[in-house]
Amino acid sequence: MKMIGFEKPFKLEEGNLFKVYEQRKPTPENDDILVKVNSISVNPVDTKQRQMKVTQAPRVLGFDAIGTVEAIGPDVTLFSPGDVVFYAGSPNRQGSNATYQLVSEAIVAKAPHNISANEAVSLPLTGITAYETFFDTFKISHNPSENVGKSVLIINGAGGVGSIATQIAKRYGLTVITTASRQETTEWCEKMGADIVLNHKEDLVRQFKEKEIPLVDYIFCTYNTDLYYNTMIELIKPLGHITTIVAFNEDQDLNALKLKSITFTHEFMFARPIHRTPDMIKQHEYLEDITKNIELGHYQPTTTQVFEGLSPENLYQAHQLLEKQSMIGKLVINI
């Protein structure tokens, strides 16, 4: 089997240090399945992980994947050889930048039948992130009618997470205010179903007042938490809930949350697979719901660019595009 990896952490300006490696196909044990990978999607987390310490070389990155089950471990009950599946993997295991990959069945689901592999692979990591935010942290109802009248502000609605989060929020009854800064990203947010699109490069508090937008029940920050921290506190309702997927780079005053009794949560979708939590199966269930909603026409895939072929050159170029932070939707590599 072929893998694309690297020996040491590196920045892109150091040049392309991705290399091709070969190893024997692994044999699945316990609840693992062996997947022949067809397509992968590259995420911002890949660019961050590339610069972290390598504990075992080569480091093979990659999270989103879709492929065909080739073999199953003795404890597997959910899948059979030949099933087409998708998943987001875990950073403490070999990643999907490879032709084959082992993954626990608890974080895998059968892929949608009505869209292509290159489309479906855009959804696992971002979809699970959004599902965990809405259902585990915000605790919205699975009954859309019970969420009517509640609202969410999604900061950076045109990114991979924002794109699917908007669709999920609309599917489950929320009013969605999102942000963008360019005409093409604004149009993309509207295509995803946003009710209102604001400009995040301008004063959001002022825009809320000018458009007479009420304070929101929930805020989902998918970009630069430090930059929007105080703004989010202003725009959330008393007893509201803010969740971010972006770690702080600066010290922030948590006491500022007290006056409104705001709940603040960090969402990290890899927490379940890294720690093998007792409820890890939820990721399988969330992916199943994504498949169902894709097949019913409630969600659309978020793929906007496809590279052909798994190579060091394509992977390096993908990381370059993501680090420019102007990506709309998701970037996919067809293996």
Curated annotation (Swiss-Prot):
Gene3D superfamilies linked: Medium-chain alcohol dehydrogenases, catalytic domain, NAD(P)-binding Rossmann-like Domain
| Pfam families (UniProt xref) | ADH_N (PF08240), ADH_zinc_N (PF00107)
UniProt KW ATP-binding keyword: no
UniProt KW Zinc keyword? yes
Q: Which UniProt keywords apply?
A: Metal-binding, Oxidoreductase, Zinc
The GO terms describing molecular function are:
oxidoreductase activity; zinc ion binding
Q: Which PANTHER family match?
A: ALCOHOL DEHYDROGENASE RELATED, RETICULON-4-INTERACTING PROTEIN 1, MITOCHONDRIAL
What family does this belong to? Belongs to the zinc-containing alcohol dehydrogenase family. Quinone oxidoreductase subfamily.
Matches recorded under NCBIfam families: adh_fam_1
Recorded protein name is Zinc-type alcohol dehydrogenase-like protein SAV2186
Source species, please? Staphylococcus aureus (strain Mu50 / ATCC 700699)
